[in-house]
Each structure stands twice: as structure tokens, then as C-alpha cells.
Curated annotation (Swiss-Prot):
Disulfide cross-links: none
Protein name per UniProt: Serine/threonine-protein kinase mos
Protein kinase domain boundaries: 2-200
Superkingdom field: Eukaryota
This enzyme's EC code(s): 2.7.11.1
Keywords recorded for this protein, A-Z: ATP-binding, Kinase, Nucleotide-binding, Serine/threonine-protein kinase, Transferase
Amino acid sequence: QLCLLQPLGSGGFGSVYKATYHGATVAVKQVKKSSKNRLASRQSFWAELNVARLQHANVVRVVAASTCAPASQNSLGTIIMEYVGNITLHHVIYGTSDAWRQGEDDEGGCGKKALSMEETVCYSCDIMTGLAFLHSQGIVHLDLKPANVFITEQGVCKIGDFGCSQKLEDGLSQSPQVCQQGGTYTHRAPELLKGERVTA
């Protein structure tokens, strides 16, 4: 049913692969067991599943998940998601992907193609629409940054990587201790930096 094809990337809590699942192209995230912080690894895996039943054009969809893994693998579980490509907003902004390398409209010869006003507005609207939907479902991302916004071949932005997300009850986090597994310090909301509770 599941056949891994090629690695797409890796991060603090796992690796992502391009794969096929029942004949469809998907992305597979294998969440690794952390010898240093098992609780954080477990929290990251379950946080990814906060969006498991949600479907929205601007959110990467979870197709399936499993906690079954061969003993030989150092894995807590596997999450199968829709494949949206390997281009992120980070690649587009900083020109770090071959698909977005210098073009004829390279302004200033800095080695990257500048975003047009139309692209900027489109991407911003996609991200805000995705965030508004997540917040309406009581989910806060807590690690929203350009590297976690994927851009499809059709130019649609999809929010992904929910390893730090929280499901809020009545619009408030249950604990002031948020995102135990990290998140990206330089992209945190001011209320998180102040140690306040998360709200949507």
C-alpha cells in the first residue's frame, strides 16, 4: 500500500518522503523517537494529527496515520499527507530552490526572482484564509513561517507542518506552557515570547 520513493527533507522530529499510497502520490512524515526528549517527540506526532479530519484548500491534508513501525525503525509513527510539492514560501522569498532561481525579471541581479505584487497578494490571501479556517476550528499553528507554507504547482499556498500546533478548548490553551517541543523562536507571536496563554 505504501511505497517510499525519495527523501524530501528532514527536521528536528522526523523525515519527510515522497511516496505512493494506494497508487496516489503522497508525502510521508516519519516521526523519529528522540533519545533526548521522548515526550517532545510524542507531542509533535500527536500535534500533527490536530488537522487530521480537516479539509481546506489552504491546509495540507492528512490522509492517514499509524503508530505501527518495524522494530528496526527508530520511529514513533507515520503520517501520510497530500503531496503538495517541495517548494515553500521560504524558497520563493530567498531564492533557494532551482524552481525559483534567477530569471529575466531578476531585479538588481541578486540571484533571485522578485515576487510580483499579484503573487504577494495571492500568497497573503491564501495564508490568511488558511489561518482563519484553522482558528475557526480551534487550532493554532505556533510555528508559522515561510518554510512551513508550501506552494503547489498551481500557485496555491498551503499551511503545513503542524508539529507544534495546539487544539484550543473554548478559545484558550489549557496550559501557559506552549509548544514544549520548540517552534522557531524568530517567528513566535509576541504573546508566546511573554509567556502568555495561546488564544485564537
